[in-house]
Amino acid sequence: MAKEELLELDGIVDEVLPDSKYRVTLENGVVVGAYASGRMRKNHIRILAGDRVTLELSMYDLTKGRINFRHKDANSTRPPRSGQPRR
């Protein structure tokens, strides 16, 4: 059986929910629920509200997605962190 086709879309994290789930607004204005991919959890990549992310959506359920990438650029709406760096 062939691997299913996935839609890749960009969005902005609106809200961080319990159990490492997120509410994301896509570029087209649709709000979906999402979770961090295993690779992001394994590498302890932190996702905060306001981050710009790339999602994968299944063709079968367009209300749930998997966050694959967190963009690090000036287009992110989160303010820069002040103070000393974390260790």
UniProtKB/Swiss-Prot annotation:
Keyword Cytoplasm on entry: yes
Keyword annotations: Cytoplasm, Initiation factor, Protein biosynthesis, RNA-binding, rRNA-binding
Cellular localization per UniProt: Cytoplasm
Annotated transmembrane regions: none
GO cellular component: cytosol
An example molecular function term from Gene Ontology annotations: rRNA binding
Keyword RNA-binding: yes
Main location: cytoplasm
Superkingdom: Bacteria
All residue ranges annotated as the S1-like domain in the record: 1-72
Coiled coil: none
Subunit structure comment from the entry: Component of the 30S ribosomal translation pre-initiation complex which assembles on the 30S ribosome in the order IF-2 and IF-3, IF-1 and N-formylmethionyl-tRNA(fMet); mRNA recruitment can occur at any time during PIC assembly.
Main function: One of the essential components for the initiation of protein synthesis. Stabilizes the binding of IF-2 and IF-3 on the 30S subunit to which N-formylmethionyl-tRNA(fMet) subsequently binds. Helps modulate mRNA selection, yielding the 30S pre-initiation complex (PIC). Upon addition of the 50S ribosomal subunit IF-1, IF-2 and IF-3 are released leaving the mature 70S translation initiation complex.
Family the UniProt entry places it in: Belongs to the IF-1 family.
Protein name: Translation initiation factor IF-1 2
